[in-house]
Amino acid sequence: MQLGTIGVWTSYRPFGPARAGEAAKLVEQLGFGAWWVGGSPQVRDLRPVLAATSTLVAATGILNVWRSDPLETAADDAELRAAFPGRLMLGIGIGHPEATSDYRRPLTAMRSFLDALDASPTPTPPDERCLAALAPKMLDLARARTAGTHLYFVSPEHTRLARHRLGPGKLVAPELACVLDTDTDRARAVARAYAQSYLGLGNYTRALLDSGFTEADVADGGSDRLIDTVVPQGSAGQIAEHVRAHLDAGADHVCVQPLGEDGIPRASWTALARALIG
């Protein structure tokens, strides 16, 4: 599957599902290789993105196992793959214990979900699915059963750790939220506000601690060092340097998520495409 080196990450929430096709056309025209659709979508929700484009890869970023039936997922996946071959990446995640009362042992639950996908009448191809894997054992499962991992809210150091754990030949595709604004105080305020919900989730804070940040860094809204690393701010050229840091750390593909622009983020996507793709 040709994800390309640079993609975008966004849910439909900022502009509404009815405009997904319009947004997808812009993403493809700008030269991005993939759109990772956030907001815990079902596979069927990606049809407008695929139908509006001819080469763009659509990816679930991510499908939540607690909210998804594996047999329905496999059937929807097979239907879209038949209609749009080579253009669908099934990103699967376990979510967070803070977000669901049904949260059980995450590794066991993910393994069971993959088993059900494989046993379905229309099994999903292992090389066209990936896991949102932060912890070492989940990364091991991603290596054994999927194409690799889609990381979220991580530093380049975590990308390096993931690459080391997965080894060569496996997908490492981190998301990178960013703020295109050269006013440092204003941009950092946007980045810090965005980061708050993630700093309240144990899976993310443990991953940040494992990649070299301290308890002080993750406390009280996040240190400037943490915020500036995980949610960089500045010009498109400055953001491109952070993208390159992930690529240098072993990422195959980085999906950028510009913050702070209402509706379809045309200006941000255009500026990032010029800086990252040319």
Per-region residue spans from a language model:
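Active-site-adjacent structural elements that line small-molecule/cofactor binding pockets in enzymes
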Residues: M1-G278
